[in-house]
């Protein structure tokens, strides 16, 4: 039995889950989740026979005893330790452990300062020990997560480097969802941003870049911002001060409507600073045939976008140049192996190679 274990049924995990179920058979695969899905994923509970809540009968035993466990979005350290002690194959997909704690001016406050907290330090020490076992495999989501996990190991092994390879990971998409299209050579440029409105998402950069283009005479650029959050009122005021007619705010919508909006727009921007461990909406936008631009600091854009389509977080002028130069541009190419089908094949190969040895 193969189990995928996450905090909830997520649109970011479903493509991989479906591919694993197709290869293993529904009778040999379970997607176990902690909380009820939201945001357009609720129907999955009824449609997919291989999903189950963690508090359902038999779920706890399944997580303890399944041949292969792939966990993400949570850190069930005790479960991992019990499985590894029995030699059961356990894989852990993770975003950043050491996201910056904030910024002092333009300089990030090192996230490794979290290790000063006794509880966080104890947890990190336990994970560093888990990484010694051939029954435990880390799957870092994005380049910064890989760096963080290597740092966790070094901190508790007297500076020694982690010898085994970490397997780079991500949130994978189903291929072929959208027909090939280009950004229009003339007419309106429609820019889209989707997510939770938090300060480190740097949505202000996108607002300012669009305003800069319009102030410079390009009146055919518009921006749609989809989502809610504590920054919404501030961003609405900012957009209004900078010529709000070009910016439309849309409340949070379900994943089906997000995909529709992606097909209705031309350009997607991931503007986050280094606090963003990944940024799954970027890969979804690329799947829908959008031209995508993203920051050097966000995990998804660092992993998926070529350098000419990236900019430094907060660099309004650079983003404005990218948007202005997008007319006639082809969609951002998805790396050929970055599909759910390819990820499922790699996952099963990784699990097959792992050594199930009790510790």
Name each model-derived stretch:
Residues 291-294:
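Short hydrophobic beta-strand element within catalytic cores of glycosyltransferases
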Residues 113-139, 145-147, 151:
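Membrane-proximal helix-turn-helix segments that form the acceptor-binding/catalytic region
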Residues 37, 144-145, 163-178, 230:
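Short beta-strand->alpha-helix junction loop in the catalytic core
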Residues 252-253, 260-265:
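Short alpha-helical donor nucleotide-sugar binding micro-motif in glycosyltransferases
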Residues 236-256:
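Nucleotide-activated donor-binding/catalytic signature segment of Leloir-type glycosyltransferases, i.e.
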Residues 306-317, 324-328:
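Conserved acidic donor-binding segment of nucleotide-sugar-dependent glycosyltransferases
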Residues 139, 182-201, 207-210, 224:
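Conserved donor-binding/catalytic core segment of Leloir-type glycosyltransferases
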Residues 328-359:
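A charged, aromatic-enriched C-terminal amphipathic alpha-helix characteristic of glycosyltransferases
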């Amino acid at each position: 039995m193969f189990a995928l274990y996450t905090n909830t049924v997520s649109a970011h995990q479903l493509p991989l889950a479906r591919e694993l179920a197709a290869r293993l058979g529904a009778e040999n695969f379970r997607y176990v989740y902690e909380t009820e899905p939201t945001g357009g994923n609720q129907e999955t509970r009824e449609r997919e026979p291989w999903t189950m809540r963690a508090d359902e009968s038999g779920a706890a035993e399944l997580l303890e005893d399944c041949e292969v466990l792939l966990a993400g979005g949570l850190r069930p350290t005790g479960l991992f330790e019990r499985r590894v002690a029995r030699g059961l194959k356990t894989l852990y997909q993770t975003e950043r452990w050491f996201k910056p704690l904030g910024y002092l001016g333009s300089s990030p406050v090192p996230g490794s300062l979290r290790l000063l907290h006794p509880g966080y330090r104890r947890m990190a020490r336990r994970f560093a020990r888990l990484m010694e076992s051939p029954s435990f495999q880390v799957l870092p989501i994005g380049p910064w997560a890989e760096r963080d996990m290597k740092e966790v190991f070094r901190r508790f092994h007297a500076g020694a480097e982690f010898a085994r390879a970490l397997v780079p990971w991500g949130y994978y998409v189903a291929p072929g969802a959208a027909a090939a299209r280009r950004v229009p050579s003339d007419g309106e440029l429609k820019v889209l941003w989707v997510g939770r409105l938090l300060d480190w998402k740097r949505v202000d950069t996108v607002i300012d870049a669009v305003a800069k283009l319009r102030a410079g005479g390009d009146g055919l650029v518009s921006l749609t911002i989809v989502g809610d959050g504590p920054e919404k009122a501030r961003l609405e005021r900012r957009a209004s001060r900078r010529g709000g007619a070009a910016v439309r705010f849309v409340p949070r919508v379900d994943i089906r409507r997000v995909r529709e909006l992606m097909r209705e727009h031309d350009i997607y921007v991931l503007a986050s600073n280094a606090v963003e461990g990944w940024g799954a909406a970027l890969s979804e936008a690329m799947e829908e045939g959008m031209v995508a631009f993203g920051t050097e600091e966000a995990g998804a854009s660092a992993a998926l976008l070529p350098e000419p389509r990236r900019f430094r977080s907060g660099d309004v002028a650079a983003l404005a140049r990218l948007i202005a130069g997008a007319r006639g541009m082809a969609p951002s190419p998805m790396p050929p192996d970055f599909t759910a089908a390819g990820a499922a094949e790699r996952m099963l190969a990784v699990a097959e190679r792992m050594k199930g040895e009790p510790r």
